[in-house]
Amino acid sequence: MTLSVQSLAMSATAIFAGAAIYVSFVEHPARLSCYPTMALAQWRPSYRRGTLMQAPLAIIGAFLGLVSWWSGGGLAWLIAGLLIGSVVPFTVIVAFPTNRRLEDATLDGASDTVRQLLITWGRLHAVRTALSSVALLIMIFAGG
């Protein structure tokens, strides 16, 4: 049972990390190369859709990582589970203020504020990318 739980934890974390890496290194830089109005118009639906996929993956990866640790998988699984799980409170506490400003319908899409908010969002997303990637590496080296 532990191996299958570990495999599922690793799978959820890998999907999260892979998507986060893609956004950090491909999608968001491309978005920033557009005019702010277009970048914002692309960010909004992308963010909403990404949230529907990424939040459950982080929660599943964290839960199954903790189950793997609890089932005798070792301290590495606890650390990995906590790392991927920390993406959710990080997003809620640290990133949501920026997200909310970007989602604000009264935000002038042509303003310099949009570009600065998108740059800030990219930096915050890079933290999620790093947390999930480190969690995945720990899971891999833990033998999942």
PLM regions and their residue ranges:
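Juxtamembrane boundary at the C-terminal end of a transmembrane helix
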Residues: 139-144
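Functional transmembrane-helix hotspots
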Residues: 94-103
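Interfacial segments of alpha-helical transmembrane regions
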Residues: 2-14, 67-85
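Core segments of transmembrane alpha-helices
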Residues: 54-67, 128-136
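Interfacial loop at the N-terminal end of multi-pass membrane proteins
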Residues: 2-60, 103-119
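Membrane-helix exit/interface motif
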Residues: 25-29, 58-72, 94
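Mid-bilayer segments of alpha-helical transmembrane spans in multi-pass integral membrane proteins
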Residues: 88-94
